């Protein structure tokens, strides 16, 4: 009985904040962006500090070591746990661990202070003031760059993608923090991304003769194969049948299938 009580308490604490109601992004589709700001979209793990605990986007409590959060503020901040580009798997592994290993590689890159008053810059100023009194290497405020025009936006996107970044976030700095999917904060990527369910593996040929060559997956677009984007380890240990993966693509074929679909990562 004691074991089950302990287990119940563990799950209760892990999911106590299961509905964090964070601000989520819509997609940029040529909307007017005069007076807006932009920043790099970091490919990490969402981190929401509620003033006492660090939570995921789903509201699950993370287990950072004490040194990591020692100088975090007594108010909410929203950001992305991130180390460097193309390290999503490592970031994800670190944040899922209960041992606390590897957190020294991460920072919480903050893009908003949800409960502060004023526009975006005034909200972020509250965090800046706190950091002057309580400096920490584990919080960094993401630079917000004023957008001159759409040409400037796409030039910045090209710069980010040339550095292997995920994309760009463009937002209205005069809008409040909205705890929903908001039309005031938009994501922009050259390659679109979607999810699908793996339904089959196919043996490779040539250099991939002894590993997976491609897989078939299925979503609202139907069934289609994905054979590129995998590294050798992913071909040797492919996403299991029934798992959900994310793929990138560039447009739609006449038959409604994704064009140039490439594997990105397994959703976990």
UniProtKB/Swiss-Prot annotation:
PROSITE patterns to which the protein is assigned, alphabetical: DNA_LIGASE_A2, DNA_LIGASE_A3
Catalytic activity: ATP + (deoxyribonucleotide)n-3'-hydroxyl + 5'-phospho-(deoxyribonucleotide)m = (deoxyribonucleotide)n+m + AMP + diphosphate
Domain of life: Bacteria
Keywords: ATP-binding, DNA damage, DNA recombination, DNA repair, DNA replication, Ligase, Metal-binding, Nucleotide-binding
SUPFAM superfamilies in the record: DNA ligase/mRNA capping enzyme, catalytic domain, Nucleic acid-binding proteins
Cofactor: a divalent metal cation
Alphabetized InterPro entries for the sequence: DNA_ligase_ATP-dep_cent (IPR012310), DNA_ligase_ATP-dep_CS (IPR016059), DNA_ligase_OB (IPR029319), NA-bd_OB-fold (IPR012340), NAD_dep_DNA_ligaseB (IPR050326)
Entry's EC annotation: 6.5.1.1
Residues bound to ATP: 111, 181, 187
Biological process terms in GO annotation: DNA recombination; DNA repair; DNA replication
Entry annotation: catalytic residues: 41 (n6-amp-lysine intermediate)
GO MF term list: ATP binding; DNA ligase (ATP) activity; DNA ligase (NAD+) activity; metal ion binding
Enzyme kind, highest EC tier: ligase
Function: Catalyzes efficient strand joining on a single nicked DNA.
Similarity comment: family membership: Belongs to the ATP-dependent DNA ligase family.
UniProt-listed PANTHER family: DNA LIGASE, DNA LIGASE B
Record NCBIfam families: PRK09125.1 (NF006592)
The protein's name: DNA ligase
Organism expressing this protein natively: Haemophilus influenzae (strain ATCC 51907 / DSM 11121 / KW20 / Rd)
